[in-house]
Amino acid sequence: MELSPREKDKLLIFTAALLAERRKARGLKLNYPEAVAFITAAIMEGARDGKTVAELMGYGATLLTRDDVMEGVPEMIPEIQVEATFPDGTKLVTVHQPIP
């Protein structure tokens, strides 16, 4: 199976997000890479489902709370930018303060 670098990146994000989802379900607090992957994957899937950029910008800030992540993680993530594939092309989604 031949994958482009972009496809490899998407697969890596998905894998990290799946791990983060499982850890969160077990009650563990997420670290920085897990939190970023969790939010990024949700944004990418939302784009695939046909949500708008504006919807995803708001949605991205509702996925995790301070209680879901380790101390200091919210301050490490002032914003997340995701290049997501929408039905009408690729667009940049920026989520400001993703962990309020």
UniProtKB/Swiss-Prot annotation:
<dbReference type="GO" id="GO:0009039">
    <property type="term" value="F:urease activity"/>
</dbReference>
<dbReference type="InterPro" id="IPR036463">
    <property type="entry name" value="Urease_gamma_sf"/>
</dbReference>
<dbReference type="InterPro" id="IPR012010">
    <property type="entry name" value="Urease_gamma"/>
</dbReference>
<dbReference type="GO" id="GO:0005737">
    <property type="term" value="C:cytoplasm"/>
</dbReference>
<dbReference type="InterPro" id="IPR050069">
    <property type="entry name" value="Urease_subunit"/>
</dbReference>
<dbReference type="InterPro" id="IPR002026">
    <property type="entry name" value="Urease_gamma/gamma-beta_su"/>
</dbReference>
<keyword id="KW-0378">Hydrolase</keyword>
<comment type="similarity">
    <text>Belongs to the urease gamma subunit family.</text>
</comment>
<comment type="pathway">
    <text>Nitrogen metabolism; urea degradation; CO(2) and NH(3) from urea (urease route): step 1/1.</text>
</comment>
<dbReference type="GO" id="GO:0043419">
    <property type="term" value="P:urea catabolic process"/>
</dbReference>
<keyword id="KW-0963">Cytoplasm</keyword>
<protein>
    <recommendedName>
        <fullName>Urease subunit gamma</fullName>
        <ecNumber>3.5.1.5</ecNumber>
    </recommendedName>
</protein>
<comment type="subunit">
    <text>Heterotrimer of UreA (gamma), UreB (beta) and UreC (alpha) subunits. Three heterotrimers associate to form the active enzyme.</text>
</comment>
<dbReference type="GO" id="GO:0016151">
    <property type="term" value="F:nickel cation binding"/>
</dbReference>
<dbReference type="Pfam" id="PF00547">
    <property type="entry name" value="Urease_gamma"/>
</dbReference>
